[in-house]
Protein backbone atom coordinates (compact mmCIF):
# COMPACT_ATOMS: atom_id res chain seq x y z
CA UNK A 1 0.00 0.00 0.00
CA UNK A 2 2.84 2.40 0.90
CA UNK A 3 4.47 1.67 -2.48
CA UNK A 4 1.21 2.48 -4.29
CA UNK A 5 0.87 5.76 -2.41
CA UNK A 6 4.46 6.70 -3.25
CA UNK A 7 3.92 5.91 -6.94
CA UNK A 8 0.74 7.98 -7.04
CA UNK A 9 2.48 10.86 -5.26
CA UNK A 10 5.40 10.83 -7.68
CA UNK A 11 2.99 10.66 -10.62
CA UNK A 12 1.05 13.67 -9.31
CA UNK A 13 4.24 15.68 -8.75
CA UNK A 14 5.50 14.87 -12.24
CA UNK A 15 2.19 15.91 -13.77
CA UNK A 16 2.19 19.14 -11.74
CA UNK A 17 5.72 19.95 -12.89
CA UNK A 18 5.09 19.63 -16.63
CA UNK A 19 1.69 21.30 -16.33
CA UNK A 20 3.08 24.34 -14.55
CA UNK A 21 5.96 24.69 -16.98
CA UNK A 22 3.65 24.32 -19.99
CA UNK A 23 1.24 26.99 -18.73
CA UNK A 24 4.06 29.48 -18.09
CA UNK A 25 5.71 28.73 -21.42
CA UNK A 26 2.42 29.12 -23.32
CA UNK A 27 1.95 32.63 -21.92
CA UNK A 28 5.54 33.50 -22.84
CA UNK A 29 4.95 32.16 -26.34
CA UNK A 30 1.73 34.17 -26.71
CA UNK A 31 3.60 37.30 -25.67
CA UNK A 32 6.29 36.59 -28.26
CA UNK A 33 3.61 36.33 -30.93
CA UNK A 34 1.95 39.57 -29.76
CA UNK A 35 5.13 41.62 -29.52
CA UNK A 36 6.92 40.23 -32.61
CA UNK A 37 4.26 38.95 -35.04
CA UNK A 38 6.52 39.13 -38.12
CA UNK A 39 9.12 36.99 -36.34
CA UNK A 40 6.37 34.61 -35.32
CA UNK A 41 5.25 34.30 -38.95
CA UNK A 42 8.64 32.73 -39.67
CA UNK A 43 8.30 30.42 -36.66
CA UNK A 44 4.85 29.35 -37.79
CA UNK A 45 6.06 28.65 -41.32
CA UNK A 46 8.88 26.44 -40.04
CA UNK A 47 6.54 24.50 -37.74
CA UNK A 48 3.84 23.76 -40.33
CA UNK A 49 5.77 22.37 -43.32
CA UNK A 50 3.55 19.80 -45.03
CA UNK A 51 0.55 20.71 -42.88
CA UNK A 52 -2.80 19.42 -44.17
CA UNK A 53 -5.29 19.61 -41.31
CA UNK A 54 -9.00 20.21 -41.83
CA UNK A 55 -8.81 23.16 -44.21
CA UNK A 56 -5.63 22.14 -46.01
CA UNK A 57 -2.35 24.08 -46.40
CA UNK A 58 -4.20 27.28 -47.30
CA UNK A 59 -5.09 27.85 -43.65
CA UNK A 60 -1.38 28.07 -42.78
CA UNK A 61 -0.73 30.57 -45.58
CA UNK A 62 -3.65 32.66 -44.35
CA UNK A 63 -2.25 32.64 -40.79
CA UNK A 64 1.20 33.66 -42.03
CA UNK A 65 -0.28 36.57 -44.01
CA UNK A 66 -2.17 37.65 -40.91
CA UNK A 67 1.02 37.67 -38.82
CA UNK A 68 3.00 39.53 -41.48
CA UNK A 69 0.43 42.35 -41.46
CA UNK A 70 -0.21 42.34 -37.70
CA UNK A 71 1.09 45.32 -35.74
CA UNK A 72 3.00 44.52 -32.54
CA UNK A 73 0.95 44.61 -29.35
CA UNK A 74 1.98 45.02 -25.71
CA UNK A 75 2.68 41.78 -23.84
CA UNK A 76 -0.06 40.41 -21.62
CA UNK A 77 0.45 40.84 -17.90
CA UNK A 78 -0.13 37.73 -15.80
CA UNK A 79 -2.87 37.39 -13.22
CA UNK A 80 -3.06 34.83 -10.43
CA UNK A 81 -6.84 35.13 -10.23
CA UNK A 82 -7.26 34.55 -13.95
CA UNK A 83 -4.87 31.60 -13.69
CA UNK A 84 -7.03 30.16 -10.91
CA UNK A 85 -10.09 30.46 -13.13
CA UNK A 86 -8.25 28.51 -15.83
CA UNK A 87 -7.06 25.92 -13.31
CA UNK A 88 -10.60 25.42 -12.03
CA UNK A 89 -11.66 24.42 -15.54
CA UNK A 90 -8.71 22.05 -15.98
CA UNK A 91 -9.54 20.30 -12.70
CA UNK A 92 -13.21 20.10 -13.64
CA UNK A 93 -12.91 18.84 -17.21
CA UNK A 94 -9.65 16.89 -17.20
CA UNK A 95 -10.61 13.83 -15.12
CA UNK A 96 -13.90 13.31 -17.00
CA UNK A 97 -12.40 13.76 -20.47
CA UNK A 98 -15.01 16.35 -21.41
CA UNK A 99 -14.17 19.35 -23.59
CA UNK A 100 -15.54 22.79 -24.26
CA UNK A 101 -15.83 26.10 -22.46
CA UNK A 102 -18.87 25.25 -20.34
CA UNK A 103 -18.04 23.74 -16.95
CA UNK A 104 -19.82 20.71 -15.52
CA UNK A 105 -22.02 23.09 -13.49
CA UNK A 106 -22.78 25.29 -16.51
CA UNK A 107 -20.18 27.95 -15.70
CA UNK A 108 -18.60 30.02 -18.47
CA UNK A 109 -15.02 31.36 -18.49
CA UNK A 110 -16.02 34.77 -17.11
CA UNK A 111 -17.96 33.08 -14.30
CA UNK A 112 -14.89 31.11 -13.22
CA UNK A 113 -12.64 34.19 -13.35
CA UNK A 114 -15.17 36.18 -11.33
CA UNK A 115 -14.81 33.76 -8.41
CA UNK A 116 -11.21 34.88 -7.96
CA UNK A 117 -11.59 38.60 -8.56
CA UNK A 118 -13.26 41.09 -10.87
CA UNK A 119 -12.56 41.07 -14.59
CA UNK A 120 -12.81 44.35 -16.50
CA UNK A 121 -13.32 45.22 -20.15
CA UNK A 122 -14.16 41.84 -21.61
CA UNK A 123 -13.07 38.25 -21.07
CA UNK A 124 -12.24 35.24 -23.24
CA UNK A 125 -10.82 31.74 -23.16
CA UNK A 126 -8.68 29.51 -25.39
CA UNK A 127 -8.32 25.75 -24.82
CA UNK A 128 -5.90 23.37 -26.49
CA UNK A 129 -5.88 19.60 -26.05
CA UNK A 130 -3.17 16.97 -26.40
CA UNK A 131 -0.08 19.18 -26.68
CA UNK A 132 2.77 19.24 -24.17
CA UNK A 133 4.77 21.73 -26.19
CA UNK A 134 4.10 25.44 -25.68
CA UNK A 135 5.11 26.50 -29.17
CA UNK A 136 2.99 23.76 -30.72
CA UNK A 137 0.05 24.88 -28.61
CA UNK A 138 0.30 28.53 -29.65
CA UNK A 139 0.96 27.74 -33.31
CA UNK A 140 -2.16 25.59 -33.39
CA UNK A 141 -4.26 28.30 -31.74
CA UNK A 142 -3.02 30.95 -34.18
CA UNK A 143 -3.62 28.77 -37.25
CA UNK A 144 -7.04 27.98 -35.76
CA UNK A 145 -7.75 25.32 -38.37
CA UNK A 146 -11.43 24.47 -38.67
CA UNK A 147 -12.59 27.23 -36.31
CA UNK A 148 -15.06 29.60 -37.90
CA UNK A 149 -14.13 33.21 -37.22
CA UNK A 150 -10.63 32.32 -35.91
CA UNK A 151 -11.76 33.03 -32.35
CA UNK A 152 -8.63 31.63 -30.71
CA UNK A 153 -6.39 33.80 -32.88
CA UNK A 154 -8.53 36.86 -32.19
CA UNK A 155 -8.17 36.32 -28.44
CA UNK A 156 -4.38 36.12 -28.71
CA UNK A 157 -4.15 39.32 -30.76
CA UNK A 158 -6.96 41.27 -29.11
CA UNK A 159 -6.16 44.90 -28.32
CA UNK A 160 -8.79 44.74 -25.58
CA UNK A 161 -7.10 42.01 -23.58
CA UNK A 162 -4.25 43.20 -21.36
CA UNK A 163 -3.98 40.41 -18.76
CA UNK A 164 -4.06 36.63 -18.92
CA UNK A 165 -3.56 33.47 -16.93
CA UNK A 166 -2.99 29.88 -18.00
CA UNK A 167 -3.19 26.43 -16.44
CA UNK A 168 -2.49 22.97 -17.79
CA UNK A 169 -3.06 19.44 -16.57
CA UNK A 170 -4.17 15.90 -17.25
CA UNK A 171 -7.08 15.20 -19.61
CA UNK A 172 -8.60 11.72 -19.67
CA UNK A 173 -9.23 11.72 -23.43
CA UNK A 174 -6.31 13.69 -24.87
CA UNK A 175 -3.65 13.17 -22.21
CA UNK A 176 -3.37 16.86 -21.43
CA UNK A 177 -5.10 20.20 -21.82
CA UNK A 178 -4.14 23.85 -21.51
CA UNK A 179 -6.60 26.64 -20.69
CA UNK A 180 -5.70 30.28 -21.32
CA UNK A 181 -8.02 32.97 -19.98
CA UNK A 182 -7.89 36.62 -21.04
CA UNK A 183 -9.35 39.88 -19.73
CA UNK A 184 -9.09 43.60 -20.32
CA UNK A 185 -8.10 44.02 -16.68
CA UNK A 186 -8.44 42.14 -13.42
CA UNK A 187 -8.77 43.07 -9.76
CA UNK A 188 -7.45 40.19 -7.69
CA UNK A 189 -9.37 38.67 -4.78
CA UNK A 190 -7.44 37.42 -1.75
CA UNK A 191 -10.18 35.13 -0.47
CA UNK A 192 -10.07 32.12 -2.82
CA UNK A 193 -7.21 30.04 -4.17
CA UNK A 194 -7.58 27.21 -6.68
CA UNK A 195 -5.75 23.96 -5.95
CA UNK A 196 -6.20 20.27 -6.60
CA UNK A 197 -7.37 19.80 -3.02
CA UNK A 198 -9.51 22.94 -2.75
CA UNK A 199 -11.44 22.48 -5.97
CA UNK A 200 -13.08 19.10 -6.52
CA UNK A 201 -14.52 18.56 -9.99
CA UNK A 202 -17.61 20.64 -10.61
CA UNK A 203 -17.17 22.77 -7.50
CA UNK A 204 -17.07 26.00 -9.48
Predicted features, each with a name:
Residues 1-4:
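Positively charged n-region of N-terminal signal peptides that target proteins for export
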Residues 6-15:
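Bacterial N-terminal signal peptides
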Residues 20-116, 153, 159:
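Short, well-ordered surface patches within globular domains
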Residues 28, 178, 183, 190-202:
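Intrinsically disordered, low-complexity segments enriched in small/polar and acidic residues
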Amino acid sequence: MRLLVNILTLSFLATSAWAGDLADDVLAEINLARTAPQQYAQILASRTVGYRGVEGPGVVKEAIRFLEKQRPLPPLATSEGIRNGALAHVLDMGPSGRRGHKGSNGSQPWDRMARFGKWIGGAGENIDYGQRDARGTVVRLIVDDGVRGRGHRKNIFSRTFRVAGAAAGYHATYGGMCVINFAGGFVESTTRVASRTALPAGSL
